[in-house]
Swiss-Prot record:
Keyword Ribosomal protein: yes
Protein name stated in the entry: Small ribosomal subunit protein eS28
SUPFAM superfamilies: Nucleic acid-binding proteins
Top-level taxon: Eukaryota
Species of the source: Zea mays (Maize)
Gene label: RPS28
A GO CC term attached to the entry: cytosolic small ribosomal subunit
Residue ranges the record marks as coiled coil: none
UniProt GO BP: maturation of SSU-rRNA; ribosomal small subunit assembly; translation
Subcellular location: Cytoplasm
GO molecular function ontology, one term from the record: structural constituent of ribosome
Keywords assigned: Cytoplasm, Ribonucleoprotein, Ribosomal protein
Family label: Belongs to the eukaryotic ribosomal protein eS28 family.
């Protein structure tokens, strides 16, 4: 398992998900690897340009329907 913390910047806010809309789905770009974009679910306030600290960088969220 990847124990190193990765930093990623929010490129685009895709939408809200969860049973009550408490989770925001975002597309992030890693600061150390500029070519890699993944989708993540974020709990709490988030906007474009925010830097996230990811404890697990391999997990990707399913797309919104």
């Amino acid at each position: 398992m990847d124990t190193q913390v990765k930093l990623a910047v929010v490129v685009k806010v895709m939408g809200r998900t969860g049973s009550r809309g408490q989770v925001t789905q975002v597309r992030v770009k890693f600061l150390d690897d500029q070519n890699r974009l993944i989708m993540r679910n974020v709990k709490g306030p988030v906007c474009e340009g925010d830097i996230l600290t990811l404890l697990e960088s391999e997990r990707e969220a399913r797309r919104l329907r």
